[in-house]
Amino acid sequence: MLNGIIVIDKDKGMTSADVVYHLRRALHIRKIGHAGTLDPEVTGVLPIAIGQATKLIELMHTRPKKYQGTGLFGYATDSYDIDGKVLKEKRLVMPFTVEEIQRGMNTFKGKIEQVPPIYSAVKVNGKHLYEYAREGIKVERPKRQVEIFQYDLLNDPSFDKEKGQESFDFEITCSKGTYVRSLVNDLGEKLDEPAVMTYLRRVASSGFDISQAVKLSEIEANPEKASELIQPIDAFFKDYETIDLPEGKWLKVKNGAGISLETNAKKVALRYNEKVKAIYEKKGKIYRPSLMLLQNE
């Protein structure tokens, strides 16, 4: 059975659940899940956990995500992207400089409180926000704390004098739960000009990047290639201190027992027969199980 992570380069128009469904059919494996939902119109990195790797999904969510996209000053929509209803239009007489846009972006770096878009999957009283929006019901959107590690221009913005609009390409590295289109909208508010996101692509997530990604169609056409394309579970723990277990300690770990280790690391990856079998965490002077991966072969 396959155990590991396949990094999919998701096409526009598909949901993350669609990708999981198609992979289950192509590989004839039920134990498959995705780490980090991508909206249908967003393309790029979607890590898919298979077999024992599904145990990593919660950990995968904790790692930063990186996006590249395009924003536009000139109008704003209710969904914060170009698929929404236009709420405000305002021609730019003079374009923003690189310095002005970057200065605005810098104000969002660090830990911030963010209000999710009304057209989002966030739930209020057991109901998705987009369901309230479709029914025309106003509801208070809950603020959430997210962290923005990077929000930068990728190149010089482009000004269309005839339309009075200015487009800009950006790169964002952020924590889970961040709505990038909200950051584009909020940048517009910061600079007192309506703004909308016109394009978004995720280029890294959960420690994997777009260079490791494959198209879903490639796997569907050649399911047997999945074993060549899959990232081993051990690759996810490349930043952990790894300790090879002698037979005696492996027998203890296999039974979930605490063990002593000659290290000061808070968490360690324990390996046996060249495979990570468990993640142990320091509890006082003893290391105890945090995540068991005994079937990682």
From Swiss-Prot:
GO terms for molecular function: RNA binding; tRNA pseudouridine(55) synthase activity. The active site is at D39. Transmembrane segments: none annotated. One of its GO terms (biological process) is tRNA pseudouridine synthesis. Its EC number is 5.4.99.25. SUPFAM superfamilies: Pseudouridine synthase. It comes from the Bacteria. Pfam families: TruB_C_2, TruB_N. InterPro entries: PsdUridine_synth_cat_dom_sf (IPR020103), PsdUridine_synth_N (IPR002501), tRNA_psdUridine_synth_TruB (IPR014780), TruB_C (IPR032819). It catalyses: uridine(55) in tRNA = pseudouridine(55) in tRNA. Keywords: Isomerase, tRNA processing. Responsible for synthesis of pseudouridine from uracil-55 in the psi GC loop of transfer RNAs. Belongs to the pseudouridine synthase TruB family. Type 1 subfamily. NCBIfam families: TruB (TIGR00431). This is tRNA pseudouridine synthase B. It comes from Lactobacillus acidophilus (strain ATCC 700396 / NCK56 / N2 / NCFM).
